[in-house]
Amino acid sequence: MKLGKVERLLRSRVESGEKLFLLLSDPEKPISPNTVKLFEENGADVLLIGGSLNVTPYDIDEYIARLRVEGVKLPIVLFPGGLNNIAKSADAILFMTLMNSMDPYWIVGAQVAAAPIVYRLGLEAIPSAYIIVGHGGAAGHIGRALPIPYENGYIAAAYALAAEYLGARLVYFEAGSGAPKPVPVDAVAAASKVLSQALLVVGGGIREETLAAERLKAGADGVVIGTLAEKDPEKALRSSR
């Protein structure tokens, strides 16, 4: 499958030596358009939307429409928590498999149900692997994941490598929304060492500038900032740099 416009943009930035900043907005408690514009002006590369249960595609389309009316030009990528998060007005979707789920539905069942919808809507699909590490949060609970222990970074790296061998072009290490601590640096470093093509992004529990910087230095291609952006935009901006 050929690279789409959004994925080409992300890869071109990484290839030029930049690190990615992915802003995450939950459509149930969305980040305001003005705040999204602030992040856009300060280097955000894409806006991820999704992850909530209590949301319909209409809610997401309405939110995207508000963002565009307010002048937000960032590429908008769906970060689906389920079929209810697939909306036609997005630019792309992280077409994800939850690699360490114990439930086949989250490994392949949801993807089979989603594929015809994504195709029909003409969304750019970015083949992605979602891997829950440590705390896991709501994503780990809903997805029936067997979270990788914080102290076993080599297991996270093995999952990442398996994902790349299976065709994933983006690997997303997730500690969980609002997690007490982020994905460990050694897990990021181990995965970065074995991945040759897939982009590696890390999210969950990143509350300080140093936490983001450490993971980027360890080899992550980008960080995902969500809860912090909702609660303290200024601090989130510092963490993304």
Curated annotation (Swiss-Prot):
Which reactions does this protein catalyse? sn-glycerol 1-phosphate + (2E,6E,10E)-geranylgeranyl diphosphate = sn-3-O-(geranylgeranyl)glycerol 1-phosphate + diphosphate
The highest taxon in the source lineage is Archaea
EC main class here is: transferase
What GO terms fall under cellular component here? Answer: cytoplasm
Pathway terms, separated by semicolons: Membrane lipid metabolism; glycerophospholipid metabolism
Q: Which GO terms describe its biological process?
A: glycerophospholipid biosynthetic process
Keywords, ordered alphabetically:
Cytoplasm, Lipid biosynthesis, Lipid metabolism, Magnesium, Metal-binding, Phospholipid biosynthesis, Phospholipid metabolism, Transferase
Cofactor or coenzyme needed: Mg(2+)
Query: Main localisation, per the record?
Result: cytoplasm
Ligand binding (sn-glycerol 1-phosphate): Y172, F173, E174, A175, G176, S177, G178, G204, G205, G226, T227
Q: Which residues bind Mg(2+)?
A: D26, S52
**NCBIfam families the record matches:** GGGP (TIGR01769), GGGP-family (TIGR01768), PRK04169.1-2 (NF003198)
Q: Which family does it belong to?
A: Belongs to the GGGP/HepGP synthase family. Group II subfamily.
Q: What is the documented function of this protein?
A: Prenyltransferase that catalyzes the transfer of the geranylgeranyl moiety of geranylgeranyl diphosphate (GGPP) to the C3 hydroxyl of sn-glycerol-1-phosphate (G1P). This reaction is the first ether-bond-formation step in the biosynthesis of archaeal membrane lipids.
Q: What is this protein called?
A: Geranylgeranylglyceryl phosphate synthase
Native organism is: Hyperthermus butylicus (strain DSM 5456 / JCM 9403 / PLM1-5)
